[in-house]
Amino acid sequence: MMRKPSQIVHCISCDLSCQLFPDSAVRVQYCHNAAFSIWPDGNAFLKKGFIEKLLLDRHNHLSSGFIFVDFSFPNLRRFTDLQWADSLANSGMHIVLISDRSLTPLANYWILKSNKIQGIIYSDDDDIVQQQKMHRLFTGRLANSKRGRTLNYTEFILLKRFVSGISIQQIVNIDNIDIKKLYVHKLRLKNKLGHSIHKIISNIL
């Protein structure tokens, strides 16, 4: 059985890196810093760049913090989990996607599907657009207008099956789909994501 990816969330507002969710560290209740987190943890370049570019000297006017989601290929497996957004939302924090170019169609799918996601920052958003989005988010407004291609439900389920290691013949049996139609959906999935299924699978954690 595949191990369920961790939903542990740590704060990046200071060097203490306190755990915020699912179990909040005791010292969090005495902290006066705004709670910001990047999830999943581990992308040091995103963390450093994001803090320096978008979080320093910016005031969050809301009572709850923000989880900025590293929506990139290595973390793809997490985003084919049907419950990932709902699980993070249980933290009480606002959810914002930081999407790379390849996963934009999947990010757009989740923007349409989930009302738990307050915003999205695309890889090609320029500095002005990024700053405008952050201002909207930190003043209680949404910044989740999508642009670009979007996976449909069938393509999402097909991606989920492939990521889970299920073969084409197994997918035919599980989803009762004609194999010719399956290959058509597979080709469309490849065109939207810009990579073959084999390359996609080989680049995830």
Say what each PLM segment does.
Residues 45, 128, 188:
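Short alpha-helical
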